[in-house]
UniProtKB/Swiss-Prot annotation:
Its main location: cytoplasm. This is Proteasome subunit alpha type-3. The modification N-acetylserine is found at S2. It is found in: Cytoplasm; Nucleus. Pfam families: Proteasome (PF00227), Proteasome_A_N (PF10584). SUPFAM superfamilies: N-terminal nucleophile aminohydrolases (Ntn hydrolases). The gene is PSMA3.
Amino acid sequence: MSSIGTGYDLSASTFSPDGRVFQVEYAMKAVENSSTAIGIRCKDGVVFGVEKLVLSKLYEEGSNKRLFNVDRHVGMAVAGLLADARSLADIAREEASNFRSNFGYNIPLKHLADRVAMYVHAYTLYSAVRPFGCSFMLGSYSVNDGAQLYMIDPSGVSYGYWGCAIGKARQAAKTEIEKLQMKEMTCRDIVKEVAKIIYIVHDEVKDKAFELELSWVGELTNGRHEIVPKDIREEAEKYAKESLKEEDESDDDNM
């Protein structure tokens, strides 16, 4: 009975006999059904890429963004329920703002990730609330700390990464990320690879239309989190499409 959650999935404050919290697992399932987001840390910064599915032709281009500015030096990429993610982005902004007001300098990313993770975890403890149905990545760059990348999931656990993927195609994306020599690459190199990975893992059968969102923070941007300029994004998309075409042609030749 406990393996299917009967009776034990009505509250986030209830454990099943085998030690599972089903409400948190359901929140993670919401993330797994979402479009893919990836973050890669390199020697001079962090690059985010998001596969933003276009569910209607009537949507205005650029709406419902999944990349957020948390602070001048911190960016955020999300997968899962967008409304939940926006709420957590506001919490992260408030934490960053309060830290600067109190101490007079930018909040360290590890501290910010821990603070927001504690907030997310608090929503897994009480029957009166539900867990957040989103996972998100935080990335920053500073001269002292270098590039940093953290991921926080609906259970409230925070992990540090060199490369991370969340969303429906996370396994395929992680496989592609593992092939990269991230520690030797720059943001300029990584942004092309991020675009390529998003195009590789995109499911054209189920999800035909999507927009590629790219942002970065690093030495190139003087430590500020910014959307990747249009010309560089288009160049990265061109590289991704050409790489896919070459791979398809090589597969045909092998057959």
